[in-house]
């Protein structure tokens, strides 16, 4: 599915969902593919479990292609697992188009995990033991990542709130 979202005249967008919230998609099921071009300025995304600017939750082998993204200012993301791009992903693929730069400012607040790119990312493929972050090198993010009210229990990071490699347990 190709999706082009253009918001003009400084429109503020608020996306609020039950479990999973994202501007493009709340939940991407297994083996789904989504290509997104985004032009917006002010954006609030909140969900109970997972929230991200593009997708709340990505299931196994889902693919998100970011083809275009203009500057996003005043971005506020909040959920248990909150991420600048995706709230929670497992064995998912995210591709950033050649020459795409993403400038994002705002805040990411997660009561369990909060990360500039991903709130929570899990690898469980036996043949993959690394995460190649170089594809995100064109991103300029000034996001304040915080744990909200439960600072003692939250994992907070500028890239990942939590990165789990459970490949050793895969059969």
Language model features: what each stretch is:
Residues 1-171:
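Surface-exposed loop/turn motifs in large extracellular/passenger domains
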């Amino acid at each position: 599915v190709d999706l082009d979202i253009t918001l003009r005249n400084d429109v503020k967008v608020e996306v609020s969902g039950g479990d999973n919230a994202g501007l493009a998609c709340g939940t991407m099921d297994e083996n789904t593919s989504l290509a997104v071009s985004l032009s917006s300025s002010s954006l609030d995304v909140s969900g109970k479990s997972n929230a991200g600017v593009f997708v709340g939750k990505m299931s196994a082998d889902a693919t998100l292609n970011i083809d275009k993204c203009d500057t996003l200012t005043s971005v506020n993301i909040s959920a248990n697992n909150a991420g600048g791009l995706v709230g929670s992903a497992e064995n998912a693929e995210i591709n950033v188009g050649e020459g795409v730069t993403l400038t994002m400012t705002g805040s990411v607040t997660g009561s369990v995990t909060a990360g500039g790119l991903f709130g929570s990312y899990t690898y469980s493929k036996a043949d993959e033991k690394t995460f190649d972050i170089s594809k995100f090198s064109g991103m300029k993010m000034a996001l304040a990542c915080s744990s909200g009210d439960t600072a003692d229990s939250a994992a907070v990071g500028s890239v990942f709130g939590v990165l789990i490699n459970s490949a050793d347990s895969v059969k």
